[in-house]
Amino acid sequence: MPRGVIDIEGIQSPEMQALKNKTTPEDLPFNITKIGHVVLRCTDMERSVKFYTDVLGFRVTDVYPETMIPGRMVFMRCNNDHHGVALVGGIDKPSPNEELHHMAFEVDSLDEVLRAREHLKKHDVTILF
């Protein structure tokens, strides 16, 4: 399909309508107010940083050297937050489903963090820290 063309039939398909009609459970014990940040693993740190800075306009806010984290870590922002995206290098080759290092969500209180943690455990989500 040519770039800039919208697939109207695809958007109106039963599968897409089902996704659009999906609602948030009313009994969630927390309320996510924002995606805080996303940390991605990359095979080519220089190329990845160049994409986020030169193409998307992000600004580098911090760099953790190899001595702090294998492969280095580069933090970047596009708003007033310290970082919205961070990259972790040191991956030899792309691995299916291993590019996402972690992501963070913001909630309104520490109590909600603890409730979210328990909720995620009940749903068999592995929490590493």
Q: Which residues does each PLM region occupy?
A:
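Vicinal oxygen chelate
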Residues: 2, 18, 42-46, 104-129
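N-terminal beta-strand motif that seeds the catalytic metal site of vicinal oxygen chelate
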Residues: 2-46, 100-103
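A short, acidic/glycine-rich surface segment
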Residues: 21-23, 84-88
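Core segments of cupin and vicinal oxygen chelate
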Residues: 29-30, 40-84
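A short linear hydrophobic-aromatic micro-motif
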Residues: 60-62, 86, 125-129
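Short glycine/serine/proline-enriched coil/turn segments at secondary-structure junctions
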Residues: 66-68, 94-97
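Short, solvent-exposed loop/turn segments at the edges of secondary structure
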Residues: 82, 98-100
